[in-house]
Amino acid sequence: MNNEDLVNIVSLCKKGNTDAQKQLFCLYNKQMMFVCRRYLSTNEDCNDVLTDSFLQIFKAMSSYRFINEKALYSWIRTIVTNQCINTVKKKQHEKFSVDIEQYEQTLDKTEEQVEYEYTQEELMLCLNNIPERLRLIFNMYVIEEYSIKEIAIRLETSANTIKTSLSQARNLLKHQLVQIKNKSFR
């Protein structure tokens, strides 16, 4: 889609045109669903966040100033990412626990350097198998490139807690990736 078409869609969205809103949603929903899947474990949560995000996007559209397609994508992605983070924070009150000692014992046995290429599906599966809070922190740090301090501020916790959570997430992911590698070479 060229810039002129996108300018027209954004302009119509600002006026509340539902056809333009549908077009904008269709343009970005698959990419934004992928963003949601990195943070949230269930399709239901992803769909809820995506819906809430686009409702928020359409409400805020009147104050949005179109620059280019890349800026629009970044703006939409930021809103979706923030919605994901807020959803995870709301679920924080639910108890989660990880038997990290069990994983550390396994990791000690398999510290070898792995030269195995993982598919995107394998990586997403591993990421979805770690606790939601650890996944959130890992995504914010590795994918969204937030600093530890920024994550601590956003999640209202200490930098040391974030560092510990990152370490736990890495260990859990490493353990799962080693298991996948071992299954592949059997």
Where are the language model's segments positioned?
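C-terminal edge and immediately downstream basic/flexible tail or linker adjoining helix-turn-helix-like DNA-binding
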Residues: M1-N3, L12, N139, I153-E156, ...
